[in-house]
């Protein structure tokens, strides 16, 4: 039935809005949530991404609406590379990722108007070329690393550093579209 309950995007990410638009979904409202994103002791990157997405969906004040939330974690082994705090940390992250494969895990959660929450974690493996100090410096100077897990955005200039991807490109950007659409439709969301 067209015109089901409204959809609220619990994220400030412009990339997530752009990705949703690619599949014809425009949220009725954007309402980012503020939760503690600290990793718990012994929590795997996958568990962290799922928990944060679920907590964001639960924390959104949107009674009677569908709520979509997501969180992306970049992991090198069991080490999380969060959003870089500054240029030095962004450069350090790129040095760590240089010439290596890492994982991007995006947790997606949808809360139905009934309060039921369903979620899924989507993992993609990304391999970067060996970066020169000049490439790292130029990328960091561009500012494109700001606000991005792992200190880079594959949809920008850093896409030129990636030699291989195994998994969902849209999960790396921040919202796996197939899984997101499936979760929404499974709970009865219709546009």
UniProtKB/Swiss-Prot annotation:
Coiled coil feature spans: none
Any GO molecular function: UTP diphosphatase activity
Top-level EC class as recorded in UniProt: hydrolase
Catalytic activity, EC: 3.6.1.9
Record's GO cellular component terms: cytoplasm
Cofactor entry: a divalent metal cation
Keywords annotated in UniProt: Cytoplasm, Hydrolase, Nucleotide metabolism
Pfam families the record matches: Maf (PF02545)
Compartments where located: Cytoplasm
Keyword Membrane in annotation: no
Site feature (Important for substrate specificity) residues: 15, 72, 155
KW Membrane (keyword) present: no
InterPro entries, A to Z: ITPase-like_fam, Maf-like
GO biological process: nucleotide metabolic process
Annotated catalytic residues: 71
Catalyzed chemical reaction(s): dTTP + H2O = dTMP + diphosphate + H(+); UTP + H2O = UMP + diphosphate + H(+)
Top-rank lineage group of the source organism: Bacteria
Family: Belongs to the Maf family. YhdE subfamily.
Function: Nucleoside triphosphate pyrophosphatase that hydrolyzes dTTP and UTP. May have a dual role in cell division arrest and in preventing the incorporation of modified nucleotides into cellular nucleic acids.
The protein's name in its UniProt record: dTTP/UTP pyrophosphatase
């Amino acid at each position: 039935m067209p015109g089901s309950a409204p959809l609220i995007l619990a994220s400030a990410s412009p990339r997530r809005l752009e990705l949703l638009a690619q599949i014809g979904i425009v949220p009725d409202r954007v309402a980012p949530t503020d939760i503690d994103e600290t990793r718990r002791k012994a929590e795997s990157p996958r568990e962290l991404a799922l928990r944060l997405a679920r907590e964001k969906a639960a924390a959104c004040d949107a009674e009677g609406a569908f709520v979509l939330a997501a969180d992306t974690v970049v992991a090198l082994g069991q080490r999380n590379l969060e959003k870089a705090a500054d240029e030095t940390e962004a450069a350090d992250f790129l040095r760590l990722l240089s010439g290596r494969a890492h994982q991007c895990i995006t947790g997606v959660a949808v809360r139905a108007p009934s309060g039921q929450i369903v979620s899924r974690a989507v993992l993609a493996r990304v391999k970067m070329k060996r970066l020169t100090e000049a490439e790292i410096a130029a990328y960091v100077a561009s500012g494109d690393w700001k606000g991005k897990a792992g200190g880079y955005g594959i949809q920008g200039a850093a896409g030129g550093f990636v030699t291989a991807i195994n998994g969902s490109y849209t999960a790396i950007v921040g919202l796996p579209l197939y899984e997101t659409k499936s979760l929404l439709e499974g709970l009865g969301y219709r546009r």
